[in-house]
């Protein structure tokens, strides 16, 4: 069974090719991963990161959130 961090990192790997601000998102992912957060907490923290961020970073974080949610749905449907 995948841990929350494993699933979050997989979501980042899956979506990284679609991001304009890869270094900024990678920094956020590295900061959040390994902290023992639940996926719901990670998504809330990412949404907080979006507040006040420039538009392309907001879009990149939304891509990451969507991919994380997609993997969660896939995991729970199998």
Task: Give the residues covered by each predicted segment.
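Non-catalytic all-alpha helical scaffold/repeat segments
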Residues: 2-4, 9-16, 45, 49, ...
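N-terminal acidic leader/helix
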Residues: 2-36
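Charged low-complexity stretches with an acidic bias
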Residues: 51-78
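Alpha-solenoid repeat scaffolds
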Residues: 18, 39, 53-56
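Short, well-ordered alpha-helical segments
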Residues: 37-44
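Alpha-helical repeat scaffolds in large eukaryotic proteins
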Residues: 30-33, 47, 69
């Amino acid at each position: 069974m995948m841990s929350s961090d494993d699933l979050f990192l997989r979501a980042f790997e899956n979506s990284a090719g679609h991001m304009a601000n890869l270094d900024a998102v990678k920094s956020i992912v590295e900061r959040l991963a390994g902290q023992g957060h639940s996926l719901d907490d990670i998504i809330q923290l990412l949404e907080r990161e979006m507040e006040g961020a420039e538009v392309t970073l907001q879009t990149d974080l939304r891509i990451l959130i969507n991919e994380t949610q997609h993997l969660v749905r896939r995991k729970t449907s199998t």
